[in-house]
From Swiss-Prot:
Major subcellular location class: cytoplasm
Binding, (6S)-5-formyl-5,6,7,8-tetrahydrofolate: R23, E81, R120, K444
Binding site for K(+): N226, T245, I247, T250
Species assigned in the record: Solibacter usitatus (strain Ellin6076)
Family: Belongs to the TRAFAC class TrmE-Era-EngA-EngB-Septin-like GTPase superfamily. TrmE GTPase family.
Enzyme class, spelled out: hydrolase
Localisation: Cytoplasm
EC code: 3.6.-.-
Designated name of the protein: tRNA modification GTPase MnmE
Described function: Exhibits a very high intrinsic GTPase hydrolysis rate. Involved in the addition of a carboxymethylaminomethyl (cmnm) group at the wobble position (U34) of certain tRNAs, forming tRNA-cmnm(5)s(2)U34.
Amino acid sequence: MLGAETIVAIATPPGRAGIGMVRVSGPDARAIVSRFVTSIAWQPWQAHLAKLLDQQGHEIDQVIVTFFERPRSYTAEDLVEITCHGSPVVLRHAVERALEAGARLARPGEFTLRAFLNGRIDLPRAEAVRDLIDATTLYQARIAAQQVEGSVSRRIAPLKEQLLELIALLEAGIDFAEDDISVAPPAEILRRLSPVLEGTERLAASFQYGGLVHQGLTLAIVGRPNVGKSSLFNRLLEQDRAIVTEIPGTTRDVVSETAAIGGIPVKLYDTAGIRETEERVESLGIERSYQAIVDSDLALVVLDLTRPVTAEDASLIARAGARALIVANKCDLPAAGDVPAEAIPVSALTGQGVPELRSAILDAVAPKGVLEHETGFITSLRHEQLLREAVEYLQKAREAVASIPHEMLLLDLYAALRPIDAITGATTADDILNRIFSTFCIGK
């Protein structure tokens, strides 16, 4: 399904830069670019030095033109990339000349949409392109790159193939029903259905960890005044973001910032010290501290090892419940007491124990090693929801194998096939595709 129109867009971020790129894709890409660059050989997949011209034929810039001949291009169409100096004026001029020559401005994500529609990539790979662009940590980029190479698609394909084989078996059983030949007894159906169901369930369940890669964690740092919450906040961020003083109540409101812990984006919340107070502004800050515990995935309850554990400390730990990680700060000081059971000793001042704290944060949300070594999990909420839908129909089919005719069983199996196909884009509605690709940047 090659695009009938030729599209153009700037493919590099806005603003001044050393270089910039304009992309042109479609049946007339080569002819359109020929209108505003000097003559080149147009050898496919080779870089050609040329000059970008204005309407009067004056040189605007010296550029590199690369022609990718269909179908061996990103979009599977004729594609031309013009690399020039990254002046916004020069880039806009190249786009304007392409528009004058018959191209139209590309919509967000339209280059990747064409790659999908033309069979160059499937939908999970297209979505992974967006995730790679949006990656804020190297770990996110690594997982997205694996998905661009097909890690999700490779796990979906055998499930679909096994399901289609079972459907074909049942369809054949219906064809031979008049001859009293049973080609698909219940035991055989269950033998074939069980691995499909179990594989789909495992893949859906992998979102529990894969979702962390994409969505990240929220983590509240809470405790009494002057236990070192802001110092720990700064230490985890590896920058001085929060104000640190010896005056109790310095932090009056929740301060948030994002850090990378083990490659996972973690939204950190530094909160007001929790204590009894009649001061109105501080009281509001303390209320927000309590709310931060409720809203966060984890709560670091910070204790001061130079002071005894109090009822307020115990109350905070109880309030955080299973989400609590107890941090015993100031372990470097001579006055530090014994570390409470289950607490992680750290020094926010020197960094002692902070690597162990980072590991404990990751271990609290995923089994040790899962995030480091697992690469086949899904990171898309859309994929997880569709897999859960498929699981529902597969479970219905398994429960009814021995009690309903094959025709009825097939209804559930076909119903399970639809969401699986929707993941890969085989049967995805246009409005869903538009919603997905509208989240891409223009030029990609």
